Amino acid sequence: MALLDEVKSELSNIDGGSPAVQKAQVTSMLYFGRGFRKVQRESSTQIIVQPQFDSMEAAHWLQETIESLYKIPAALKSVDVKTPQGSMRRYAVDVGARAGFALAVRTGMIDPRLNRIVRGLPTDLSNGNIAQIKGVWRGAFMSAGVLSDPDKPSALEIICPNEETADSLIAMGQRLGIRAAKHTVRSSVRVHLSDPDAIERLLTMMGASSTVRDWTGKRPDTESHHRANRLANFDDANMRRSAKAAAEAVVKVQHAFDVLGDDIPQNLRAAGQLRIDHPDFSLEELGRAARPQISKDAVAGRIRRLLQRAEKAEQDAAMA
């Protein structure tokens, strides 16, 4: 099995998480699977939902999730597509015309007030939490992701249906601390990453922790290999100390959440949640992942105030 297929297979077997995260991934796969179009039939316009994938496991995940999450029947079909390289087997998830409009509205792909297609990703996903953002990227990669072989120059690309969707995906990547670029190849709009460390982090955040080790471990650049696996190798003393400090910070933040419950200002809660979601991020990377972005000093200050608040609450409780 090719490494790209292994990545998509691993992502397809991840527990979908909360309904909000599953919805984010379903919506992303419908967009990047290019399965949404309007068709004029007689006197009415029908919505056809039939995304196609090169991975049968990805298509099967989408079929099962549409049926379980939205209670809408979906059929899995194989389709032979003619390409310049010859015939290619694809896998389509067919929702059918009757349920297509309902699914499009519920996933935010169409504005029911204007009966108009939303060209970029829906706003509720762009403004969603970190878990939803990861779900969007996971769905995009499962649908239209390309990954270079380990012996080739590092590259990860997402083939996008339009400019607006590419812009939305890039903005979401920034919230994960990932900087991606947009470019066009033969009229195809793509979101592109070339930094091997960024690719390794993104694949890990999407959930491909096993296959990303294969991708990184087979790279001929030994220095890049060790850098990309800094948390697993612990050969360098500075890296070991940084990883230990980050792990301790996660434990302290989680304890503060348990102590304070709902009595936490939103800005302090958001900073603490960023540390829990990204235990291997530097303070600068956490600041870039915040929305809106903040400085590393602001992140450090908010986490410090959160811990101080929890410590004071424990002291007050002990004296009561």
From Swiss-Prot:
It holds the Pfam family HTH_WhiA. Residues 282-315 bind DNA. One of its GO terms (molecular function) is DNA binding. One of its GO terms (biological process) is cell division. Keywords: Cell cycle, Cell division, DNA-binding. Signal peptide: none annotated. Transmembrane segments: none annotated. InterPro entries: Homing_endonucl, Sporulation_regulator_WhiA, Sporulation_regulator_WhiA_C, WhiA_LAGLIDADG_dom. Belongs to the WhiA family. Involved in cell division and chromosome segregation. NCBIfam families: DNA_bind_WhiA. HAMAP family: HTH_type_WhiA. This is Probable cell division protein WhiA. The gene is whiA.
